[in-house]
Amino acid sequence: MDFTPSTGTPGEFRRMKLTYFTNEFPSDDLPGLARQLHLHSKDRRHHILARFLQDATLAIREEVAQLPPALKDLLPPFESVLTFVEYPEMRKGPLCGSIDGVLLSTVELATFIGYFEEFPETYDFESAHTYLAGLGIGLLSAAAVSLSRTLADIAYVGSEVVRMAFRLGVLVDNVSEQLQPRELASHGTPDSWAYVLPNVTREAVQQELDVIHSGEGIPETGKIFVSAFSQSSVTVSGPPSRLKDLFRTSDFFRDRRFFSLPVFGGLCHAKHIYTETHVQQVVRTKPMDMLSARVLPRIPIFSPSSGSPFPAATATELFEGIISEILTQVIQWDNVIQGALDQINILSPSEFQVLVFRISLPIHDLMAAVNTELKGFQATTKEIMPWVSHTAKDRIPREPSQSKIAIVGMSCRLPGGATNTEKFWDVLEQGLDVYRTIPPDRFDVNTHYDPAGKRVNASHTPYGCFIEEPGLFDAPFFNMSPREAQQTDPMQRLALVTAYEALERAGYVPNRTPATNKHRIGTFYGQASDDYREVNTAQDVDTYFITGGCRAFGPGRINYFFKFWGPSYSIDTACSSSLATVEAACTSLWNGSTDTAVVGGVNVLTNSDAFAGLSRGHFLSKIPGACKTWDCNADGYCRADGVISLVMKRLEDAQADNDNILGVILGAATNHSADAVSITHPHAGAQAHLFRDVLRNAGVDSHDVSYVELHGTGTQAGDFEEMKSVTDVFAPLTKRRSPNQPLYVGAVKANVGHGEAVAGVTALLKVLLMLQKSVIPPHVGIKNSINPQIPKDLDKRNLHIPYEKQSWKSTPGKSRIAVVNNFSAAGGNTSVVLEEGPVTELTGVDPRPSHVVAISAKSKVSLKGNLERFAAYIDTNPGVSLSHLSYTTMARRHHHNHRLAAAVSDAEQLKKQLTSWMQSVESHRPISATGPPPVAFAFTGQGASYKSMNVELFHTLPSFREQMMHLDALAQQQGFPSFIPAIDGSHPQDHAHSQVVTQLALTGTQIALAKYWMSLGVRPEVVVGHSLGEFAALHIAGVLSAGDTLFLVGRRAQLLEQHCVQGSYQMLAVRASVSQIEEIADGRLYEVACINGPKETVLSGTRQEIRNIAEHLMTKGYKCTALEVAFAGHSAQLDPILDTYEQIATKGAIFHPPNLPIISPLLGKVIFDDKTVNATYMRRASRETVNFHAALETAQRISTVDDTTAWVEIGPHPVCMGFIRSTLQSTALTVPSLRRGEESWVTITRSLSSLHCAGVEVHWNEFHRPFEQALRLLDLPTYSWNDKNYWIQYNGDWALTKGNTFYSSQQQNSAAVDELPSGPRTSTVQKIVEESFDGRAARVVMQSDLMQSDLLEAAYGHKMNGCGVVTSSIHADVGFTLGQYVYKKLNPNTKVPAMNMASLEVLKGLVANKNTDKPQRFQVTVTTTDINSRILQLEWRNVHAHGPAEEPFASAKIYYCDASEWLLSWRPTLHLVQGRIQALERLAEAGIANRFSGRMAYNLFANSLVDYAGKYRGMQSVVMHELEAFADVTLTVEKAGTWTVPPYFIDSVAHLAGFIMNVSDAIDNQKNFCVTPGWNSMRFAAPLVAGGRYRSYVKMIPTVEDDSVYLGDVYILQNDMIIGMVGGIKFRRYPRLLLNRFFSPSDDSTAKTAAGETPPAPTTTAATAITAATSTTSTTSTASTGQPPKVDETSPVDSNSTAARALALVAKEAGMEVTDLQDDAIFANLGVDSLMSLVIAEKFREELGVVVAGSLFLEYPTVGDLKSWLLEYYS
């Protein structure tokens, strides 16, 4: 019939959709389909798919647990329901129906879910015109969709469908077995339970069956029956034996065409067999009850028997109907077709779409019927299966555990001279076997080798594969002394070196990206022996025996050097250590514990015992050569050295980081050969199982693997077992590899031997190089003929051993995949699946015409080496991109203190620069070791602006453009015109814009430039703005918001245009000083607008006035230049606008406290406070003189800037640079941002290059980030090491002759500690060690450990010179605590009176040791002869582990007083104090006194001397004038520790005095610092309360006796009362050069005071800590270090002088030559660490009579510093 769509609204489109779930697997390649679904489940877009697979697996595990043991044992362990595809035999066994049902429902629903997750916009199952159909298990899958409101619901419902499919299969198997039993473990293909007869009618078949059944007397359960029929065929079912008999004996059936169906699980569609009880057994479960309570049927499903939708109101009813259908009803697909046609006629849709997995016979029949019955109707089918094979290139892992792992860096030291990966490849490609006789630096092979095996402890083989000179090491680079380097295992040292090289090649820069955050990087190294510790360093156990020899310190040392916070693991699994380590690193990356992993393996052979032991265990080959893998005479392996490091990341992180991806790990796993005949014997079955596991998890077909790198040790058993497992999995005979899928195998041990702990990663490195070179190198292990146990049919399996070099090129659309296999002698097996890295296409272009290229090193020798390597690279790669070169050398490399950098625009410039560097490298000086220089921003005035600018950055730098557009939008929002036309080059350069536009454009450009510099890490510590430039400066300093800045600039420009006449005034630049102009002006009128330098002055006035003065000055020989400006700033021309402008600024702008010091050209001083800059200031700055010269001089005088300051000029052209250089003539560096007539990037790159060479830490990654997609990381040469050979030779033959007994020593138990009396137990008074009370007298001794956490935190809360210092407030708390304790002891029932902590005198400061693991104790003794005297005496001493306490370093008294008397005595003084406070307020308002915010005050304090922690920072604001100040104080409410009077309370109210003495410009703090040795009294009449608000006031006055000593009284006020006072607080001034000496920690808790022998030192020291020089006692033993160091004969120091002897002693202890001790050498870089410092200090005392502190090398960090000090005091 013709189909006519229903009439409705014109243009209405109505679609009917039918989704069909088949009863056949939708793919012939079921394993391939499962792999693809598994891979998709790892994608972030397919989290529902992943959840469905997880839930389905859990459901089946629950069902399996309920099976009888006989059935349960048939099932293998499974990680996923998809695992069952790997066991095709199970689909023909007793549970075949369950397995098929599980697999079919899983793949159908997984495919369905995944498709609509991929194309979510096509998921439309809400429509009323949606129907479902299915056959068999497909009906259950359809039910999952019917019951789900959303796609996510299908994961939940679907898992129950899979459960039901499994239960259905179990039921059918149980019932069918009663009809025809079978063996549980059936073999071969079982008989079918169903046959199909095509081209026959149901009636004919049924008639014949009726005849047969009536005549034979067959029981009802044994009858053959029709289970399905259609117009084209009939299916009959029954017990297999009866079916076979039927088709053998019946003429009707025998003579017809028929075929059996793969129905092996039993009978279905048999209403004579199954009952409702069976249905309920399948459906009625607890999970189903829960499901039915949550979901309802929503979409109708056609019944295959009736053709009508299942009549179900609940989920349970729906499933019962479906299970009943499957078990009892005949399939009648024609009814489904008719049902669909009926619905089409009812709905009259415009389109009928059938969604299928793939086209099948039922769908053919359906579509044929639709097209026949409904003419002119659009009917379509849509297949969803093709989606599964689609592999998205942009796949994003769903979570870290689904990520691939990229290898992005590699480095090695391997036998055969393979000191890098290229040389290693040469060994492989040339097919070299690099074995040799054991070299003499390991042990004497002549004495330690016995081929007969009769001598004790001797090796049976003299051969191995060895690294050349494994002792080579650049010790200073890694901050190790030669002595420590010599005692450190070369495995550890080479791990450090190769880790650095691998990271360098990986482009690692700390914290460059999230994945390179140092907190998220871990190290993982495999190591299985400690030869060097056991043999070499054990000959003379010394300081570094443990740290240098124990294997845990290897990866730990890498973490420590690079400051990685992630885990560090040393892993030992014998021969598989390094590949197991790779798996451990992958696991860490997969579980999210780390983001980057440095991974490797190490093995350096020096112990003859291991050779002997392996010989006795029959592991080693006696035949010359490396491992003879697969050779007929293979008799064991050949030992080998090796050190390899790799860098690994998750693939998505590596791609985001723009790394070079060398290879990608798809999977890694380890198992154990538990069923092997012995622990060391391999097991093919376990290895094959591991291969299958790792391939399945990786989602890789074994036939897609084209190379397997075998363990291949060269043993008869091992080679056979491994090859068997490889052939079984990768090249089986049953499913053979196609001709275009050859499999190659190889073993690197044939080239470089068996590296044991490093073997696995050596094999991995080989495969990485093969991928890189696209070549499979020849296998050289077969020296004679192949091992006869190896299968003879390798060619038949398409498996090949490459006897010659083979090509291994990439195939478009298909990745090369390899497997690396590794065994452990302890029974473990580890395998890794490796894929070639993705090809990264560059996108975009780098528009920058100039590029910074740099080379750096830690030593001059290495700098020269790096330069030579770099030049050689350029010669070899003449066409290299400068963009890539800059990106690699700047953003992807470490930058050391020896730096060379230049901005170049072409290869020729680069070559010239390299030549210049080569000529000058010997005279190169490193950057300062004290840290990067401070940076100052100078903002240019309007004179630098063009009329119309074309700022290239606006077009080429996205961040700059965005900033400018944002600022322009802000300006327009305030009613100003857009200023973009003035900077975008849209107008000619001479086009004059309005002043509003011009000035806004300049300010906007300056703000954007400043923000850009700051984004590059060039952040100012001070700013200055010249005239108009001061607006941008104030914004960067935090005073003005961007909006207010533009508002003030724009409104002032508007006022100028409205009230002033352009051109009526003029400005004149004169090359003369103000005084010179005044002298010769001769009464001519002018105003001084700007004083820019000593002889750089700008005048302003009317045009005539300026003409007159100019002519006069020029006649006197002074150069004059008229400035082209529309208005003459800082002149009378602005007078008409000033009042209005001030009003506008008052109302329209908010002025914030500065977060940076501001050098004010208006005031000629530096602004720190939040009161100075206001509307009046803006008025004055517009009108009054710009005294740039005076402002800079003031800033220099008060040390806001100094000679090291790097100046960056912010503006379109450098103007201020000249002013700065003329005023601050010794300034080292000034650079511009832009320069008129020069391309922007040329200027910026030159400036960046200069800043970089000056030591500024530029964020180079941020510089390159906008263009990174167009940039590639180059594989440049690695660092050129300044290597020396550090090696302790094993001497003699004691390893052979040693006995078999061991000596042991017992440590005597320390004497029991007497029970100590109880005490206050506060943070400062921790325990009472002695006390005696006799009547009214008392003596108490307490001891405290400065390393106790609360006390140590308190000390580090008052940090000086980077050290934690016990502040005087801590001593005060000790005094108050002990005073309270003693008084209560003697007067237990009496309230403790107020206490005056008086007469505090600190002779020597107490500085916290850096080593917090050892106690640092001090002792305080308090005595009184009579408590009624109301006086206590206190003395402080240092206490050490051995020996008596030191002489007192501090003393004080406690007076018990009446607080009310104090209050009365202070009352007359109150008005005087308040009067001074008010006077200071007035001075601050007038701009005479300085007002500081609390934050600024403490920043200044920290920059000068003391860096306070937050709890100590009580001062909220300070007003200071010269030596007088007051502060508003709020005490912290943060609690930490147990105190009597918290030190941070005392400090907060009292340290205003210290602030004055170290910050006030009345004292030269640039050259001096001031500390307090104590006070006369400290009294608090009221307790200091957390959160309390106080005011402190003090005026410091120099003493008459000594002008370096100052005294003052600190008054503490609260609520207009004096409640406390620190009377007579004393400060002494010291030269700043003594700061290091006074404030450095003693590095040993056993330190004793050095008395009388130290150089001159202050006689009084700070309570806030001046350190004592200390000597240390330590015992050292020196390993054999070869020749003693030689004294440099050319040294200008007398060789017999103390200085020369001291340097010789340093060289000896450190194990270096005196010639290494150049004046600029830094001891820390030479490896003189804290431990060695203690040893050297003791040697100085013993051998030279020079007593020094353990911190000597902190005070004198360079050789030159130490030499100068020694010459000064000991010449």
From Swiss-Prot:
Transmembrane segments: none annotated. Disruption phenotype: Impairs the production of geodin and of its intermediary metabolite sulochrin. One of its GO terms (biological process) is fatty acid biosynthetic process. Residues 1326-1636 form the PKS/mFAS DH domain. The modification O-(pantetheine 4'-phosphoryl)serine is found at S1730. Pathway: Secondary metabolite biosynthesis. Multidomain protein; including a starter unit:ACP transacylase (SAT) that selects the starter unit; a ketosynthase (KS) that catalyzes repeated decarboxylative condensation to elongate the polyketide backbone; a malonyl-CoA:ACP transacylase (MAT) that selects and transfers the extender unit malonyl-CoA; a product template (PT) domain that controls the immediate cyclization regioselectivity of the reactive polyketide backbone; and an acyl-carrier protein (ACP) that serves as the tether of the growing and completed polyketide via its phosphopantetheinyl arm. This is Atrochrysone carboxylic acid synthase. It comes from Aspergillus terreus (strain NIH 2624 / FGSC A1156).
